[in-house]
Amino acid sequence: MQVGVGTRMAVSSLRSAGNRDVHYTEYPAGYMEKEWGVHPHGSWTAAYRDAAALEWMFSRTRRDRYEAEMLCPGVFYIEDFNDDSMYLVEGRDKALLIDTGLGDGDPLAFAQTLTALPVELAVTHAHLDHMRHSHRFARFYMSKKDLPLLPRVQDSFPENTSTAEQVIDIRDGDAIDLGGVAIEVAEVGGHTPGSVVFIDRTHKCLFTGDALGLWMQVPMALPISTYRDNLLRLQAKLAQPGYTELAFLGGHRRQEGGVHPGEPYVPNSYEKLEDMVALCNKLLAGEAEGEPYPVDFGEPAFAVSYKTANMVYKESVRC
């Protein structure tokens, strides 16, 4: 069945699919012929009959598009179609891209449109929605504790040919020097063995990855008791002078909601960090029980909340 589509609807559909290069402008009848000597309907008719033009128009997609927002001078927020959050931090000598997202585009090329500085990569943890494009960098920063997860990324995206030799291992207390801006590393293993957060005291930002908006039902998640102890170490670090009033910036904007759609807006924060420690303690003490959650990885998953904190877990990590 063929459905007739007017030009306005065609342009609207193309823009909804992510094509920012197609525009619709309506002029009074006869205006274009009088002013420019062209008949617009003839132009569109020709375009609709041009197979190459149609292929170009309808191959436009949001999957390879990125949106960027300047959070403050020197820090950009970048988002792909999958609600994956990336951040670009500028120093005097170079810039650091934190995570690569899952989009079909080229996050390195996009980052290079935002800064004139050389761009390096730091990965919060080795999940495909955070490091699909690590192969675009000659070397990158990541905890080598997550290397066993790299084959899972490459099973889904064989073009990712990153090797262990390309990984610059990062540990608790390390710092990545961008020139006048130091990005500090804090290990918060739980979601994965090598999960880290990055602290930028210059711009007052804490990049949390998936350390607080938390799935603990995934393969290789650590015991909840280990995760809690790592959170306590992070709490102690953030209690030191110079670590107050940091903006918590997560790996996905949906982390700012609850476990289920429609729950209240709850951004990552010092309060959520405190509540997550309490939630871990309640789970370990048997004082909190989750409800079945639809996304699992071969073992039943449960979702549980306490104040501003929420977690999806499996019973095998409840120890």
For each feature predicted by the language model, list its residue ranges.
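Active-site HxH/HxHxD metal-binding segment of metal-dependent hydrolases
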Residues: L102-L178, L214
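Conserved beta-strand hairpin/beta-sheet module of binuclear metal-dependent hydrolase folds
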Residues: Y66-T113, V197-G213
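Active-site-proximal loop/helix segments of hydrolase catalytic cores
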Residues: G189-T226, L231-L232
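C-terminal catalytic histidine-bearing segment of alpha/beta-hydrolase fold enzymes
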Residues: Q2-R63
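Short acidic-hydrophobic surface loop/beta-edge motif
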Residues: E69-L71, V89, D172-L178, Y293-V295
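Accessory terminal helices/loops
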Residues: R63-R65, L232-C319
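Active-site neighborhood of phospho(di)ester-bond hydrolases with catalytic His/Asp-centered motifs
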Residues: L97-G101, P118-D129, F140-K144, E187-G190, ...
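Core dinuclear metal-dependent hydrolase active-site scaffold
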Residues: G173-I199
